[in-house]
Amino acid sequence: MKIIDLSVPMINTAKEPYPPKIEYESHEQGAEQAAALLDLEKSDFPDEKAWAVETVTLTTHTGTHVDAPWHYAPKSEGKRARTIDELPLEWFYGDGVLFDFSDKEAGYELQIKDFEQKLTEMNYTLKPKDIVLVRSDADKHLYEENYAMIHVGVSAEATHWLIDQGIKVMGTDGWGWDIPLPQQAEQYKKTREDNILWAAHFVGKEKEYCQIEKLANLDQLPVPTGFKVACFPINIKDASGGWARPVAIFYE
C-alpha cells in the first residue's frame, strides 16, 4: 500500500489570506507551566523540561479543509444547510478521480466540456460518490504573495454537472473552488450580473455538496483513477468547514 499526502502544511509562512498563527512553547516553558499547575518547582522535572505545546489561531477555512453546505448558504435543497459535524462520513472515503488541468492559465474557468474531454481521455465514466480532484498546481505557490490568485476555477454549470453525476465531494489544489475572488469582482463590476460572485459555491443552495480546498501534491498521483481518497473533516460543532488531511491510497 502507498499513501500520498494531499494536504498543505499548517505553517506561519503560508501566504493565504487567513494564514494560521502558530505559537510554539518549548519543553523548558512546559516545565514552568507544569510546575505552576502542580505547585512544584521547574527543577523538579528531569533536565527542567516537560511538555512542548503549540497554540494555533486560525479559521475553519485555513489550510486544507472541507467546506460544509452551511458555508455556502443557510439553506440547501430547501432545508437548513448541514454543518460539517452533520455530514455522513461515508462521503469522505471513495474512489478518486484526478482531472489534470495544470496546463490551463490562472483564472481559467472550467466548463462541462473540459471535464467531459478529460473523461474521454481517461476512458472513464464518473459514478456516484467518486471523489473528484482538480489539479492546477496552485499549491506550488503557497509561499508566494499571489497564492490565492493563481488557480483555475470551476464554473457553476460544471459544478451542477458534477453533482448530477452523483459527486458529493470535489476538491481543488487552488485557494478556492471558484475563479479567484478579484477576478469575480472585476467581472461583476462590468456586468452586475447575479451569476458571477461565488457562483460555484452558491450551487450549494440548490444541491448539497462539499468542496475540499487547498489540496496539494496532486502532481504526485501516477494515474488519474484506480486509487482511494480519504478526506475526513475534523468534527467541529455547528461549523461551516473543518480541517482535513486528505490522502490518496494505492492498494498494491
Model-found features: residue ranges?
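Active-/binding-site microenvironments in catalytic and ligand-binding cores
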Residues: M1-E252
